[in-house]
């Protein structure tokens, strides 16, 4: 089991990235916080050491994406009606970034993943291919298609 110092170090290093991945996938602050906690619990129980900081970062990205997918899969099987909650994140954003965020969040999951990892986490296509377990050319194709969709939906100043 990891020490408190290890946990503090990775929290300082990866917390923002993990939160952003959670929100991009789940689109809900409360669910994102639950998955965020699950990711760090998995880290605490993770026995293996990491080969490098890049390996550790990729591990956090992959585990977070998997945890979000598991969360969505679990709740998609449940019949429930969500409570009407004001989406705090959207209210806090200005109109321009809010419009961009809405369009990015509306992308299919595979495109959201590559856009996030490429532009926000600054991974290369080769690194994204490794994280997602896809071929490099697939990542390039998804990036191109995602950009085309964003250009079509945003138009105007974004084109």
Each language-model region and where it sits:
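C-terminal flanking helix
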Residues: 15, 19, 40, 108, ...
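DNA-recognition helix of helix-turn-helix
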Residues: 65, 69, 132-157
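Sigma70-family region 2
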Residues: 27, 38-55, 74-75
């Amino acid at each position: 089991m990891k020490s408190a110092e290890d946990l503090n170090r990775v929290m300082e290093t990866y917390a923002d990235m993990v939160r952003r991945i959670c929100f991009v996938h789940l689109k809900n602050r409360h669910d994102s916080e639950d998955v965020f906690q699950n990711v760090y619990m998995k880290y605490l129980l993770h026995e293996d050491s990491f080969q490098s900081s890049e390996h550790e970062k990729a591990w956090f990205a992959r585990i977070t994406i998997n945890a979000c997918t598991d969360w969505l899969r679990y709740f998609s099987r449940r019949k429930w009606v969500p409570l009407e909650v004001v989406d705090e994140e959207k209210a806090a954003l200005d109109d321009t970034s809010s419009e961009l965020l809405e369009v990015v969040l509306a992308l299919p999951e595979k495109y959201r993943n590559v856009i996030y990892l490429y532009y926000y986490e600054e991974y290369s296509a080769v690194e994204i291919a490794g994280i997602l377990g896809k071929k490099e050319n697939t990542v390039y194709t998804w990036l191109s298609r995602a950009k085309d969709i964003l250009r079509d939906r945003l138009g105007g100043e974004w084109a």
